[in-house]
Every structure is written in C-alpha cells, then in structure tokens.
Amino acid sequence: MVGRVKVPCCSVCHTRYNEDERVPLLLQCGHGFCKDCLSKMFSTSSDTTLTCPRCRHVSVVGNSVQGLRKNYAMLALIHAASGGANFDCDYTDDEDDDDEEDGSDEDGARAARGFHASSSINSLCGPVIEVGAHPEMKLVRQIGEESSSGGFGGVEMWDATVAGGGGRCKHRVAVKKMTLTEDMDVEWMQGQLESLRRASMWCRNVCTFHGVVKMDGSLCLLMDRCFGSVQSEMQRNEGRLTLEQILRYGADVARGVAELHAAGVICMNIKPSNLLLDASGNAVVSDYGLAPILKKPTCQKTRPEFDSSKVTLYTDCVTLSPHYTAPEAWGPVKKLFWEDASGVSPESDAWSFGCTLVEMCTGSTPWDGLSREEIFQAVVKARKVPPQYERIVGVGIPRELWKMIGECLQFKPSKRPTFNAMLATFLRHLQEIPRSPSASPDNGIAKICEVNIVQAPRATNIGVFQDNPNNLHRVVLEGDFEGVRNILAKAAAGGGGSSVRSLLEAQNADGQSALHLACRRGSAELVEAILEYGEANVDIVDKDGDPPLVFALAAGSPQCVHVLIKKGANVRSRLREGSGPSVAHVCSYHGQPDCMRELLVAGADPNAVDDEGETVLHRAVAKKYTDCAIVILENGGSRSMTVSNAKCLTPLHMCVATWNVAVIKRWVEVSSPEEISQAINIPSPVGTALCMAASIRKDHEKEGRELVQILLAAGADPTAQDAQHGRTALHTAAMANNVELVRVILDAGVNANIRNVHNTIPLHMALARGANSCVSLLLESGSDCNIQDDEGDNAFHIAADAAKMIRENLDWLIVMLRSPDAAVDVRNHSGKTVRDFLEALPREWISEDLMEALLKRGVHLSPTIYEVGDWVKFKRGITTPLHGWQGAKPKSVGFVQTILEKEDMIIAFCSGEARVLANEVVKLIPLDRGQHVRLRADVKEPRFGWRGQSRDSVGTVLCVDEDGILRVGFPGASRGWKADPAEMERVEEFKVGDWVRIRQNLTSAKHGFGSVVPGSMGIVYCVRPDSSLLVELSYLPNPWHCEPEEVEPVAPFRIGDRVCVKRSVAEPRYAWGGETHHSVGKISEIENDGLLIIEIPNRPIPWQADPSDMEKIDDFKVGDWVRVKASVSSPKYGWEDITRNSIGVMHSLDEDGDVGIAFCFRSKPFSCSVTDVEKVTPFHVGQEIHMTPSITQPRLGWSNETPATIGKVMRIDMDGTLSAQVTGRQTLWRVSPGDAELLSGFEVGDWVRSKPSLGNRPSYDWSNVGRESIAVVHSIQETGYLELACCFRKGRWSTHYTDLEKIPALKVGQFVHFQKGITEPRWGWRAAKPDSRGIITTVHADGEVRVAFFGLPGLWRGDPADLEVEPMFEVGEWVRLREGVSCWKSVGPGSVGVVHGVGYEGDEWDGTTSVSFCGEQERWAGPTSHLEKAKKLVVGQKTRVKLAVKQPRFGWSGHSHGSVGTISAIDADGKLRIYTPAGSKTWMLDPSEVETIEEEELKIGDWVRVKASITTPTYQWGEVNPSSTGVVHRMEDGDLCVSFCFLDRLWLCKAGELERIRPFRIGDRVKIKDGLVTPRWGWGMETHASKGHVVGVDANGKLRIKFLWREGRPWIGDPADIVLDETSG
C-alpha cells in the first residue's frame, strides 16, 4: 500500500493547486493562494492593490495577478503528484468521491428506465410520502457543494433514502440539510413547513415537498429527487434553449406557479436552477415558499430605516438572488406598494419568471456583471429592466412572447400578467410547433448541435464536420469568407446536393438560416458564396416568415440587396403570408436610399399600400428619411402623394408637417402637372398643404416660407382656408406678424384683399393682433381700408376699437386717414363710426397728429374736459398764449391746479403757476409714482443740473411736488433728485412677445391681481397707449393687465430647450401624469400664452407645463465641473458619500437624463439625474488655493498641511483632484475641489479697475470714483474684499475682488500718450496737447505718474487713466512684419528680425522702430504698428524647414524638408546656424523659414494606447490589449493611470509605454472597424456596412454613435472597435 502525502490546497477555495487556473501565486507578504481566487479578489478591488486575506498586508499588484511570483516549491509537489505518487488534500474526502462515482451509474440506469424520482420498491405509498410512516432515513451521498442560507451555518443537498417500518417500502429522495442555531424558533419553522406541505401536496408541476425531519442538530427537508434543471439543460445547449423548449418549460412552470398561487403559496425564488426536470423531462418548480420561513433570525423584525449605501436588504434576510428579485421584494421600497412586512405578492413571482425567461431566451443571467448594490440601484431606484431583455429582439422569439416578458418586468406589480394568462400564451404558441421528442434524460439520442433541421439530411454520418450546420453558422457570423466556401465545397464533394441543401436550410436557435445570417451581417461576399450553389433558396424564410432580403434591408447593405436580386429574389413579395407590408415598406422603414433604388429598379411597386393603409412614401416621410423618399419619387412614387392614410393625411401633408422642403421640391420637379394638381389641394383635417405650411410656428419659419413659395408656384389654391378658423395662408401669415411670409405670398400674385369665410381681409387681422410690420406691408400692397367684414367693420373701425389695447393702431389711423377715399363716416352693423370708438378712449391717448388728421377728414371729437390733477402741455401751434408765457416755455409740462371760469385754468409748472386757456393746452399721459424714467435724449443740460447720475441712468419716480417738480430716485443715491417733468420720459422696458415674470415680492398691483400668482411667467400680448401691459399667462383665459414695473424680464424658453420641474414646485399647475422632478423633456412647442408642450422620453403623449413651474437644464457636456443643487433635498439615487459641498467632473451623459460624475474620493462615478446638478466655475492650472475655513477634515487628508497652507495648482486630474505646489514641499499637495477655496489672485500693489461685464451698475463707491478710473490694491482682507487707493481721492475704499480686473501697471521708462477721445485730463492740460508724447519718470504708490513730455519743461503730473502706453518693442525682441505691409528689398510680410532701436526726430521719438533682418546690410525702419511680436528661437532647439518654403534663402546645403537639425548659433540679425548629423558644414537658415519640433509630453486627458514595441507592460496587461484605447486620468511620479471604457478601475502603466493618438470628437464620421468579429457590447442592429457620427464621448472614451437610418438610443461602442470614416463627407 503506497502512503499518501498531504498536498496543501488553497486556503480560500479549498481546491487542489494545478498549473492552470489554480496555479499557486505569492503575495508580497509571502502568503500564497491560487490564481483563480486572487483574480476574483482583485476584480473587486478599486485600485491596483490587493489585501492579503490572512495578514491584511497590502500588495501592489498592478493591472493583473499575472505579475505575481509563482510558488515554485508548491509546483514541485504538483509535478511529483503527476509522477504517480498518491496525495491527499486536507479539505477533500475521498470516500465522498467514491460514493458519488458509485451512485452515478445507478442514477443513470434509473433515469434510463424512467423511474420516478422518489421511486420505491412497491407503490403502496402513493405520490406523497408520509414522513411519519417512514422513520428510517439514510443519507447516501452529498449532491453539489455546500452553500449558506439565511441564518443557517450551512445548507447541504443530499441524495437519501427513506424506508417504512420493517422495511416494507423504500424511497429515493433529495434532502436539504440545514444546521440549526440556538436563536432559531424551530417549532415555528416546523409549523410553517407543515402548512406549506399541506398547501402544495396536490399541485401539479411542482417538486413534491414531503415534509421535514429533525436529526443530529439539523433540519432535513425531504423532496422529490429530479434529474437536472433548466439551467443544466441550458448548459448542455451551450447556454441557450430552443423555442420549443422555452415554450414547453414555460408552460410547465406557469401551470405549477398558478396552482401554487391558487393554494396560497408565493414562490419567491423562481430562477433556472430552481426549475428542475422530472423523469419525464417536464419542468417542475422547487424551493417554493421557503424563503420567508428560512430567513435570518435577525431579520424577523422590520427595520425602521434603510441606508442605501449598505446593501443589507430583505433579499439578504431571505437569501433571494438579486438577479431575479422583484422591486417590491427589496424591502426598503415596500411603502410604494403594500403595507405588509416584505412587500411581496403573487405578482412578485411574475417579475422573477420574467427574468428567468430572459435568461432562457438569451443565455445570459439578468444584470450579469453587476453587484447587488448596482442591481438595487437599477431595479428599485432607476426602475430599469434587465439590459439582456433588449437582446431578445431578433433572436426568433415570437413578438407576443417578447411582449409578455416585458409585461412581467413592469415596475408596478398590478401591471404584470397572471400565470394563468401566461400559460394560455405558451399553449397557444405550442400548438404551432410540431411535437418533437422530449429533451429529458430518457432520450438517449445525443444532441449534436443547436440548430433545428428543417429537412432531415440523407447523409448517414452526421458527425462529419461539413455536415454540421452549426459550424457553417459560426463562420458566417465571424465573417470568415474562406471558411464558408470550404465548408460548402466539402459538403458538395462529400454528400452531394442534398448535403449542401441541408446545410443551407438548417436554422439556428433563432430560426435563421446561413443566408439570413450572411444578410444580417451585410456581407455581399458571404451572400455570393452561399448563392453560388443551385441548392440555395434565395427566398428561404425564417421561422417568422421573413426572407433574407428583409435582413439585407435591415442591415442597410445595397450590395447584399443587389446580389439577392441578381439571384432572383422576389422584390414584390409581402410579409405575413402576403397580408403584411411589402419589402419596399420594410426598406422605407429602415431608410437606406441605395437599397430602395435597387428594389425599385428591379420592379418593386413604389406605390404599394400596406395593411394599415400606408404607402411606401408615407413610411419614409414619417421616419424623416429624406433621401429614401426622394428615391421613391424618382422611381415612380409620385402617385402616392394622392393617397390618404387612416388619419386622412397624404405624404404631402406629412412633408409639410415635418418641414421637409427637399422632398416637396423634388416632387414638384419629377411629377407631371396632372399628378401635382391631383394632390396639391387635397385637404387634411387641418387644411390643405398650403394652409399647413403658412401656419408653421417659430423656429421653422424659414422652411415654412420655402414651402409656401414652392406650393404656390406649383398651383396651390391661395383661397383655400383652414378647417378650424377659416383662414387663408395670407390671413394666417398676417395674424402671426410673419412679414417675410406675407411678402412671399404677395409676390406670388395673391390679392392683398383676399377674403375669408367671414369676409375678413388680412389687414383686419393684422390690425386686430397688432402685427405692425404686416400692417405696413399690406397697406403698401394696396389693402383697401374701406372693405367691411360680416360685422360691418372696416379697417378704421378695427384699428380704433383695438387701440385700447394696441397703441400703434392710433398711428395706423393717421396713416390710413391719408387715403383720399377713407370711409370714416361709415357705420358698422352696431351703428358705430370711427368717432364713436375714439370717444371711448381716454383723451390723453389721442395725439395732436391724430386730432389734426381727423379734422382734415371732418371728424370732430367732443371738447376735452379737464380735471384738477390732469397733466398738460401747450399745443405745438401756440406761439403766444393769451395771458403770456408767465415764465413757462412751449415744451413745459405741468398739471392742472385750479379750474377758473370761462375756460381759464391755473397750471403748476416748474417755473411757477401760469394762467392758460383750455384750448391752449392738451392732455398728457401722466408720470406716476413708482414708474421708471430717464432723461430725454434731446435734453442737453437738466434744469436742476447733474448730481452723480449719467444720461443713461434709470430712476424711479418717488413723488410729484405741488409745484410740478418730480422727485426721482437713482440707485446708490441718498435722496431724490429734482427733475422737470418736461425733461423726463418713461422707460420702455418691454415689447410685444417678450417673456416676463411677475415680481416675486409684489404685494399689490395697480390694476389688481385677479387670479394671478406672483412669480408666474407669461408673454407680453400688447402694449397699451399708456405704456401699461397686457400679459398672457398659460392658466388665464384672458390677458392680465399690469404696469411694466410690476414685472421683470426673464430668459425665454425656446423650442428644443431641455427642461425639468423646479424642485421648489411641490405640485405643478398641470398634473404630474406619472412624471417626477427627475423627468427631463424637450420643448417641442410653445403656445402663444407661454404654455410649454414637452416631449419626454418613453412617454406616449406630450406633457403640458406652466413655464413658471419649469427650469432649463444646463447644456452639460463631459468635462463640466458640477455639484448638487442647493434646492435638491436628495439626488435621484441617494447621497451615498456625496455632500452638498462636493465638486466633481461630468464623466458621462445618458440619453435618459442620468449622468455619471467623477469625484476624486470615489473609485466609481456617482450616478444621479441631470436635474440634480448645476455647473460651477472650474479650477485652472496656475490658480492659488487654500483650504476652506469650514473644513475640519479634508476628503483627501491634510498631508501634513494646515488651514494656513497656500498652494498653486500645477495639475488637475480628470476626477477634479487638484495637485498643488506648496513652498518647501517636495511632492504635490492633493486637494479635493470641494474642500478648496480660490484665492483672489490679487497682490498688494496690483493695478485694477472695474470689470466691463458689470454693465451700468457698479458699486456705488466705485460710481463715485468713475468706471474707467484706475486704483491700486492697498491691502487684502480675508472676506475677499480689497482695500483700494487712487491718486485723486483721499482715503481708501473696499470692493470685492470679483468686481475687479487686473491691468498692467505703468512703469518708469515707458513711452505714453493721451487716451483717444479724451476731453480733458484729470488736472487739466497744463500746456500739454492731445498729441503730446512723453516718458514716465515716476510712479507713485497710489498710481499717480509724472511724465516728461517732449517740448514741455518740468515733469507733468497725470492720472494713469488718462494715458496710454505707446506700442513699442524693446531692443533684442524678435518681431515679424505684419501681413499687408509693402515689401522692402528682400524683406516682406512674414519676415522675422531683431529690434535694434527706435527712431528719433530731433529730441522726440518719431514712432518708428529699427529692425535688423538677416541677409540685409541695412536696417529696416518703419512704424511700430507694422510689426508684431514673434517667438524667439534659442540655441539647442530642433527645427526643420516649413513645407511652404520651396527654396530657402541661403540654399538647401544638401538637405531637404525632411532634415531635422539643431540650432547651434544665432546671429544678431536672427540668422540661424543649424547643425545636422548628415551635413558636412553648418546650414544657414532664415528664422521665418523654419518651424520648431517639440515632442509634447503626455498630459491628463490625452487619448493613448500601448506602443507596438511593448510586449508586456511593467504592471501587466490585465484586461487591456495592444489595440485598446484609453484616456489618461491621473499622473503620479512617472506612472500614468489610464481610464478604459470597459474597466471599472484605472489601468496603471509607465509613461514611456504609451503613445498619443487622435481622440474621437463629437461630430466625427465613423464606422465599425473592418475585420472585427464582435464589438465589445454586441452588434445590435449594426453591421460592418453601418456608418454614423459620434454624438457623445464619455470621459473614459466610451463612444455614443448615431448610425444612419437608425432610431432610438445611440449605439454604445469601444473606441478600439471604431475607426474614422474617411469616405464620408
């Protein structure tokens, strides 16, 4: 007997070491573990280190455990073991292995005989075993591995036998053995299990639960023993099931769960491994109802609160698999559904079953690759479905089944289907499939491949390689052209035509043949290779009845379509057995124009109508595939323009509705006049195409004009009226004040006096709506002011009536009254004339010009009645009043103080009281308290003088004194300024169409609030003659009357803006309708009253919103600096470790509104909604920072620094980490941006002035100093305020540093002159002149300068704000001659030289500069303005000749453009002496002829890949390969941390191992790399023929691509799989 030697095993997994995945590796601490365990531990690490499981020592691993040393001593033992010695492992039991081997044959035999799982020696016991009558239980062998469950120490599955007393019967069962602990309520558990047994004992399609036995401190659950599971069956089929298996197993499970629900049992644990197969191959449900019974004792009571950062959920208590757990079963969100303890219900099983079906259909576990916390965030917080669900589409699953699975995954339990309904669905589809032999263990025929043979091959040797269809499908999917040809050739040579036919007709699990797969890939070469054989059927259909031509069209490959048509594909076929759409409809759905051209040229019907009444052209226009629609029209599809669909819309109507000018223009070009006339005037529900085009709203007015112009030229009826309002195109354009469109219609010959159904002409509508531009154009075009509508109103009536709202109409009355035939005496049907309407207006609204125009037409208004307090002025025709001027002037304004007899009145003017006659004055619109006013433009000097304010200053009327003087308050002034009312005018702040907001702090309104709420937003409807406003609000039926001072301007919303509901709005004015604060939508339409129509993704109908409830979302892009808004109480997915002060960098942007933000203290991006964050000012390299005073513990630690430490930012990582240089510190100080505070950047002695961006409202102190004044920083305060001093003011004042900008200080020796346009210097001219020049001799600490002007004795004292530095260069500076300067000798524009001095005329500088250019003996002298600064070259720089230089000035000297040399010397005139290794002598070059070569080092943000010369990086490859593309994220002491889109952690390497590559940018035209077998995240609907453009680039390089003719979300791709498309654009 040979002795056994103990071989140490891995202490983590208890598995013997080997030389493959279990090879022993050593950590830096000396402890060793197997490679597989270390890889799994490293995969959960957030960085490049790994903590030893035994001693907790941290080892630097790099990018992969491959770099760790092997334990060669252990490997020697493994080699010795393979030599024949017997070894044991401390953690294994040989007897168990032997028992398992012994039992395997018996199990196989029993399965082959078809015995029931719990078979017995005799059948007296029935299907359910009475545990009490079978006291003898023996555990035979353990099945599988030990696992843990709930609060139990371990759960073991055993193969066991139970026998009745006296050995009368014996049964084979499966036993779940669980160790009991002291804190378990065993009695309660046994009672619950007994109730479960009784409830389920008569249910079908369930694994029978026989009862529970307590033995040896364990609880044993007895149940039927089965022969595999759905999961094992999937593994046998390479991870997938056939459609038949999905339907059969689905029906079995649905039946079993439905019966359990009827018995009151909720399964709670449905997943493929718990769906077992009995001896007959039927699926049965196991582990039902056990989860709540076997939960942890610590979870018996409901926790009062939940911390989402700790994934200790209900799933932990009941040990549910998170991959299949319904949202309501996660515990913390139970309040969203029910009030019971766990939140589960029978509908929860529907979710689990849906996830299980997803795995059965795709072969992938739902949420595969995500942690439990990530699954919780996705399922409960984001309400997402498993991403694998999307992969079901296109794999041969019936649409009804796919839809049913989607309904199972509804977030709301009430929306999920019942299991009875699902059973009916499965049975209905099973009836359509011929019954095949069961896939049970009894079926002894081995499954050869995963395809269903349509016709059984005649070849008897089905194991031959070429006869296996799976191989053919594999090489087709890989694009292996030679492999396809070889397989088909061997099949033809070996088995003849029948073998080839069987290969080509075979279908994969998705029901597709090899030809379908080749077309789906878009490879014309593969299609040709298959169709070379006569046995190939070009119109073979898949299980859904689709021919290969449909797949080629979906792939967008015109080459494949051409090959199929050449081989006889039927281009006039229809889908769904002839009752569905034609292949042309399929092509128009996908939109590839070249494919459509191939079909139509081959004979496809361009005017075919599908089963929904839509033509091919309808489909193309609806999808906005313009090129495809044009191809249809060019190939006989013009007749489709006359076909109306179910919504009574023709393709022409749809083109107008989608502003598709190109299609309509091409239709007019290719169609006959008869075809155009038949289609152009067909009415839609809203009117003809012309009416629709004229009504196109804002942001598309240009397209609307083009459409109207095209349609009118093509013969559209201009008198056609829309169905709703009875307006023609001209009426609609005039009412919308679209003057360009009105001009287009009039230029087309349409009569300006065209009438609508109400006999209204366009001029009437323009006057009624205040469309002033259109009124002017219509009057110029001959509109008749005398035409009356059905109410008898002409243009005069309408203008006078609307003047109460539209003040411009009073001016239009003056214009219209000039018409020689103006019908001013005509009465309307109500008996009113123009005079009646004007009499109803306040007399002060009627100007003197209008009164004179009316008098000329014989219209006399009643005498004006004056009252005390009325504002008046003298009529302009008064030259000498009856009582004289009495101190007043012709333009004086006053108010009535007393009314005397005989029309005499006492008027209070600023100059005093005056007696005037009533017919000598006219009424004026008064200025009232609170109104905004300013000085009239024609006033040169105010009556009461200036007092600090400027001509542009806007003030507020405080009061009107009894003597007629106004008191006006200005910002910053301590008291009111006296003003003559004749010199002031009201400020016009708003015009029609402006967006305004009612002031939030408004407590009372002059004209009343009504139903209006402060803070509401609206649009100015019109401006009344008294300057008051009518504002349209979305929630009011009529405009609201207000004063301009009661509202404030607000940034308007525009079509296309992305918006969300404000966080301060608890309940929006228009109901939520299922939306939340996190819902993000795009404005698609804006009503006249400001009502927003918003398109929200995944919402079937638009959502309405009041603009005051909404806010714009910043136009974020990757790289923006952001933080959580102050108004956000909690981000969409919780705070986690983020605080309000945290600042991060935008990492990714999803289309659904979610964003990923990189924070320097997190290893993974923080997920939240785009509505949760706002932009902040980013930090920049070079800025000085210190720690914010409120910070006690920085995120990244103090690093031996203090709150007083000041650092200069030297580098910024992509996660926002600030690396700052601190004086006296060797390494950079790493600071979180949320902890840092930016210093002002100013120093004592800096020269500053007010920022121009402050507009007209600087601080009051600075206003007293003067906007253009210059000050000097005297001291810097901690609060951010700077103490300033200036040369003309005593004392100092404080201003915040954000209001200031730094300017260059004047220095001694600089040449200066006076500022252009200066009227007088601060202290007068004092013999100086505006053109004087001088040199600064002294600069004082307060900025005062002393200048020595040429020709003036002594030093001249000056304010630096009055002076300007002369542009001049210092001696030795390198300069370049500017473009446009005339040539001098060999010197021309672009020549580079060196400054040698300046020119003088006598003792004064003449403004010229002397420059030495190489190659010229004389120096160039000319104006300094002809020169610009050039980059100075230095010795040692590498250079080469510019490609634009054909012949260097001093010759090539044996060199070429490719020669690179080093500057060895530079002459005083700039001539370069270049050394090159190839040259025999020094090479002379002109500095203007060369360019420097600088090898730029890698920096953060660069796109990189590993150099081709690197075989193994210093820190190993890990998951990265030589073609991987990443982005430099961080730099640390020569090491680079690179972010790859497929890695969660940063990849570590040396800087020298990488090379810079061109980054992808938004807008790049791209395609999928040739030769790529499978993109990293799958093909989706794309192929190698797909071309598109980049619409998004994440910070880690992940690309979001919009491919041509594809709808929905962008395609996500790895940049290594994508290349630039050089052929596009």
UniProtKB/Swiss-Prot annotation:
The yes or no answer to whether the keyword ATP-binding is present is yes
Outcome of substituting residue 176 to R:
Loss of kinase activity associated with the loss of ABA-induced KEG autoubiquitination and subsequent degradation
Report, as the record phrases it, the tissue specificity of this protein.
Answer: Expressed in all tissues of young seedlings. In flowering plants, only detected in the youngest part of the stem, anthers and the receptacle of immature siliques. Not found in mature leave, older parts of the stem, flower parts other than anthers or mature siliques.
Q: Which residues bind ATP?
A: 147-155, 176
Identify the stretches annotated as ANK repeats: 467-496, 510-540, 544-573, 579-608, 612-641, 647-676, 685-720, 725-754, 758-787, 791-826, 832-863
In what way is this protein post-translationally modified? Autophosphotylated and autoubiquitinated in vitro.
Q: Does the keyword Zinc apply?
A: yes
Location of region: Disordered: 91-110
Quote the EC number: 2.3.2.27, 2.7.11.1
Q: Which UniProt keywords apply?
A: Abscisic acid signaling pathway, ANK repeat, ATP-binding, Endosome, Golgi apparatus, Kinase, Metal-binding, Nucleotide-binding, Phosphoprotein, Repeat, Serine/threonine-protein kinase, Transferase, Ubl conjugation, Ubl conjugation pathway, Zinc, Zinc-finger
Q: Which reaction does it catalyse?
A: L-seryl-[protein] + ATP = O-phospho-L-seryl-[protein] + ADP + H(+); L-threonyl-[protein] + ATP = O-phospho-L-threonyl-[protein] + ADP + H(+); S-ubiquitinyl-[E2 ubiquitin-conjugating enzyme]-L-cysteine + [acceptor protein]-L-lysine = [E2 ubiquitin-conjugating enzyme]-L-cysteine + N(6)-ubiquitinyl-[acceptor protein]-L-lysine
Looking up SMART domains in the UniProt record yields: ANK, RING
Please provide the Gene Ontology terms (biological process) for this protein: abscisic acid-activated signaling pathway; defense response; developmental growth; endosomal transport; late endosome to vacuole transport; negative regulation of abscisic acid-activated signaling pathway; protein ubiquitination; response to abscisic acid
Q: Domain comment text?
A: The RING-type zinc finger domain mediates binding to an E2 ubiquitin-conjugating enzyme.
Q: What is this protein called?
A: E3 ubiquitin-protein ligase KEG
Source organism = Arabidopsis thaliana (Mouse-ear cress)
What gene name is listed for this protein? KEG
